[in-house]
């Protein structure tokens, strides 16, 4: 229940974005209908329900309509005092007295130190519900302290933000031909509360020392402030620009921008000026959006900025203090490194507030309130190769990434290029997209260049395509070598659909590696190599390859017999990373040799691993903060995408052979870790680029999107494409589209 676009107000846009986030994350599991709030009867309603907020009887009519709709399970009221008629909007009580569905609220304003009448009214509102959302911790504290509301019914959810691909301002400015300019910006529906005058007056002082500054004032004037076609506030601002002689330094963008264009302007901003003058403004969407686009900020002190804007992200100044705005802005303009670091800190800080993560918080609360056992499943994101391609040069896939910017100085590894070859090959097999082939050639060529005369491989190559001799000498390269064999085998297994030159190169490298493969000792290396050997043998049966598989996996059996006990059915006295490859190796050895011992150990060891990763408390990734040793308690946190991806790959192999439906359920549970079913309830991928985040820590996500994490996420996502299910048929009842309008 809310205003909704095309109505031009911040709450309308907030509601639209919240719903889009929910639909993006949960898809066909749920539908959202709108009860649109209007000030007068609407001739042609576009939403499922419409409420004339000035008609007291209409509140009862709408409540009865909703009561009679069996599909409606919950009513979520977006609450602002000005949205509803009556004293403090008390017409809403007519609806609450009549509605029989569960109700929750979002309070967009929480007024501290209320008078007795306001306090009584707010407590009365919440007597109709045991749930309310607020957007700041301070709002939660005010409700508890000033209104005597119990903490258990309050859910703190940050104002949502759009996920963007990180860029430096200089990169983003190219789109707007603003290279070389120092860009300041402010956006939103303009009005007196925005206090743009302060920004302009500060600008007149700033340009004395920084004449190359351009101040973007983005957005239309609030429609309620345009009377008889006269835009008094904008006229006032333009007159001030004239008075201060700032024509060369100010650009009014007097239009509603679509979301992506707005975000591009924010990414091109060197410093965002948040000039609001309302000391009681609980939350600001414009402030949140600016931080999420990596803008360093100079911001007025309001409750939201005081709570969120730490000194490593920007500077807080007194409301309306022109000198403080100018001084802080000049300080930041004089230090490029400081601005860049502040922008990155702001970007990292706001990722938890993405609309996808906000949707998860809402849905977790909704499921507590809905009065039946409705199953709500995650929807699978679109398969995206944007970041994979961004990480790839003509030499190969770059190892690391600084947020989403590839770090060329980190060089290249056989590990990453082998994984990339497997993943992009899977994508080609699924889609037949010939744009994948040049990338497969790049990764294959890298593997080919890494191969030594004896058939083994080096792993580390620098940005100039030179071998890292010391690193390759110091590090045990068995795992990376074995991954190379896995990748080569995966290509050869696709020989019927790939160009001959790709298959020929892969076959040449593969056969050359076989004498080395016989000598592998480490368990995981045996597993990776066995996977490649099995894939080769599945399309080109070869007694020598079969013999190597048997020889290697006999070593694994020996390991198992040494270490396995009644309560620890495993190949070693510890669980580390990529554990699923070991039972998977046993499975492939069984499929090639038909020896019962391999099947027995494959199933026993997989069951043991699943018992450690899938518990009554949910899915648990083996922590890299300290491996899980036999007889000890497992460590917490320090979770990496590679382990999640590997268990999905393992379960996929076992499901394909044994068709045990439990394996499929485990796969879905594990993949949900990427989608937000983890201890932070946050997504582990970038939905815009397909980048995979590098790790899930105790309190935060590592937002770097390196090769390993990105390819592991992609591999898991490609596997899950085979298991996509429409759980139920749902009609999308969101009928309107509008450009982004924010007035908060």
Regions found by a protein language model. Give the residues of each.
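Donor nucleotide-sugar binding/catalytic pocket of nucleotide-sugar-dependent glycosyltransferases
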Residues: 127-167, 178
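Conserved donor-binding/catalytic core segment of Leloir-type glycosyltransferases
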Residues: 178-194, 200-203, 216-218
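Nucleotide-activated donor-binding/catalytic signature segment of Leloir-type glycosyltransferases, i.e.
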Residues: 229-256
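Short acidic/histidine- and often glycine-rich active-site loop of Leloir-type glycosyltransferases
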Residues: 283, 302-316
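Short hydrophobic beta-strand element within catalytic cores of glycosyltransferases
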Residues: 296-299
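Conserved acidic donor-binding segment of nucleotide-sugar-dependent glycosyltransferases
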Residues: 311, 315-322, 331-336
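A short, well-ordered alpha-helix in the C-terminal region of glycosyltransferases
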Residues: 324, 331, 338-352
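Glycan-recognition and catalytic cores of secretory/periplasmic carbohydrate-active enzymes
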Residues: 356-358, 364, 368-744
